[in-house]
UniProtKB/Swiss-Prot annotation:
S-adenosyl-L-methionine binds at residues 29-40, 69, 90, 152. It is found in: Cytoplasm. It catalyses: S-adenosyl-L-methionine + a thiopurine = S-adenosyl-L-homocysteine + a thiopurine S-methylether. Its EC number is 2.1.1.67. Gene3D superfamilies: Vaccinia Virus protein VP39. This is Thiopurine S-methyltransferase. It is an enzyme of class 2 (transferase). Belongs to the class I-like SAM-binding methyltransferase superfamily. TPMT family. PROSITE patterns: SAM_MT_TPMT. GO terms for molecular function: S-adenosyl-L-methionine binding; thiopurine S-methyltransferase activity. GO terms for biological process: methylation; xenobiotic metabolic process.
Length: 245
């Protein structure tokens, strides 16, 4: 990070079709957790979220905050500790249990009656509820609306063919006055198949622009040694803020 290379915009990678047919099954995601292939997890939390936390929360109290494809994101406890109510969805039961264990939180679990085979895990404090199910089944559980959505590792993990369906679900969960932070990546998609998938600025605007004002807050070169195995030499993270039009 932070070298002198120019930050490339997504338009400099013209082959936006390279990943369009790429599909990962839910079983493959669950296997990543079983096999500890969770390089996407950030033990110290997300640095750009820390930087823009005040912009995201806007000084408001007792918000409902949604974490799509939450994994064991440490930021869920950050928000709960600040007095907010956190709801997440994750296909891996292992990931959810790891979250509660690693954060030293006691919890209960119960079936979600509206979704066969699904469960909800609730912290004993009552302000963290994690749904173990397919995200696309979640609306059937009537989880209500949210003031804030933190979308990191979610849109970029959804199969490209499911993005419109995904954005429709996300927008259906927003309350009036919502604020939505989205993190996406730009890299050469002909060299790495994903996930995380390459998402262009144009795609972000197509998916969310009809309902949201869209502001790109920052672009950061996040290239690390592990990215060399992807066959790339640069990866740019873009952080967007969506607000209600």
């Amino acid at each position: 990070m932070g070298d002198s290379r120019a930050l490339l915009d997504s338009e400099e990678y013209p082959n936006t079709e390279a990943q369009k047919d790429r599909v990962l099954t839910l079983e493959e995601w669950q296997e990543k957790w079983v096999n500890h292939k969770t390089g996407f997890h950030q033990e110290q939390g997300h640095q750009l979220l820390k930087k823009y936390l005040d912009t995201f929360l806007k000084g408001e109290k007792a918000l409902r905050v949604f974490f799509p494809l939450c994994g064991k994101a440490v930021e869920m406890k950050w928000f709960a500790d600040r007095g907010h109510s956190v709801v997440g969805v994750e296909i891996s039961e292992l990931g959810i249990r790891d979250f509660f264990t690693e954060q030293n939180l006691s919890y209960s679990e119960e079936p979600i009656m509206e979704i066969p085979g699904a469960k909800i895990f609730k912290s004993s404090s009552g302000n963290i509820s994690l749904y173990c199910c397919n995200l696309f089944d979640l609306p059937r559980a009537n989880i209500g609306k949210f003031d804030r959505i933190w979308d990191r590792g979610a849109l970029v993990a959804v199969n490209p063919s499911d993005r419109k369906r995904y954005s429709d679900v996300m927008l259906s969960l927003t309350r009036p006055g919502f604020r939505y932070l989205l993190s996406v990546f730009s890299y050469d998609p002909t060299k790495h198949a994903g996930p995380p998938f390459y998402v262009t600025d144009g795609e972000v605007k197509k998916l969310f622009g009809s309902v949201c004002n869209i502001q790109c807050l920052e672009k950061v070169d996040v290239f690390e040694e592990r990215h060399k195995s992807w066959g790339i030499d640069q990866i740019i993270e873009r952080l967007y803020l969506f607000t209600e039009k």
